[in-house]
C-alpha cells in the first residue's frame, strides 16, 4: 500500500484468463490488481521513457509505445520484463526536425495505438499505413491501409509545422486519419480529416473480411433498427465481437432533438446535461 499506488492512470489492460487488471500510471509503473477483489498485488517497472500506451504480452512481459512528438523519437516500441529489462526495441524511420525544439502533437482521448483482437496484440499509428501484430521478437504486418492521396505527408503534420496552427489548418485539411477496430467478420474504420472545415465531420468505412469488400457508411454512423435507439459509431472493442460506442451527453441531446424517442430508453430517461458520457455496448451476431 501507500501513496505511491495512487496516481493518474493512463490506460488499462486485462487478462481475463488469469483474472488480472494492469493499470499504467504516470509514475513509470504498471500497477497490477486482482480483478475479483480489486486487491493491489504488485507493480511492474517500465523503461524510463515517455510512454503513451501499453499492452501486456503476458503477465510479466510489457510492450510500451512512445509517441514521436519531438520528431526525433527513434524508438517506437519497447519490449521489457517485470524487472524493467529491455528485451527488444522496434524503431521508426519517419523522423523530422522541429526548428524551435518545441514539442507539438495532435491527439485525442480516444486514440488507440495498441489494442487486442483474440490473443493478438495489435498496433497502429495514425501516421502509419500498416497495422502490426506485436510479439517479443518482431512486428508482424497484418493489414495495410492504402489511403493514397489522403495520406498526410510528414511536412504537413502539426508537429512538423512547429505550432503554426494557421498553416497546419490549411495544408493538413485534405488528409484523413483512421482508426481500426477488428471483429471476427468486419473491420470498422472510423475516420476524420486532420484539419480544416471538414475536421468535425464523422466518416466510417467497413471491410467485410470474408467477402474482401470495402464499403462506406453514410453519415459515419450505423443506423440502429431498434425504435428510439442511438446509432453506432464504435470507439473500441471489448472482445472479438463486442463493441463499445461512447456518447457525450450533449450529442445525445442533439440526437433527441431529431428523434425524441431516444430519451424514452429506460437507462436514458433520467439523463441530465451534466452527466458523465454514456457507454453503449453492442454485441455482434
Where would I find each of the regions flagged by the language model?
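Short coil/turn segments at the loop-to-beta-strand junctions that recur within blades
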Residues: 1-6, 45-52, 93-98, 146-151, ...
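A short beta-strand motif characteristic of beta-propeller blades
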Residues: 1-4, 39-45, 87-90, 96-103, ...
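Blade-loop segments of beta-propeller domains
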Residues: 1-21
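Repeated scaffold domains used in trafficking and secretory/extracellular systems
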Residues: 6-12, 48-57, 109-112, 174-178, ...
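Short beta-strand elements that form the blades of beta-propeller/WD-repeat-like
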Residues: 19-25, 59-71, 78, 112-133, ...
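Short loop/turn segments that connect beta-strands within beta-propeller blades
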Residues: 34-38, 80-84, 134-138, 208-211, ...
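Loop-centered beta-sheet repeat module
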Residues: 78-139
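Conserved blade-ending motifs and adjacent loop-strand segments that build the rim/top face
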Residues: 142-171, 209-240, 253
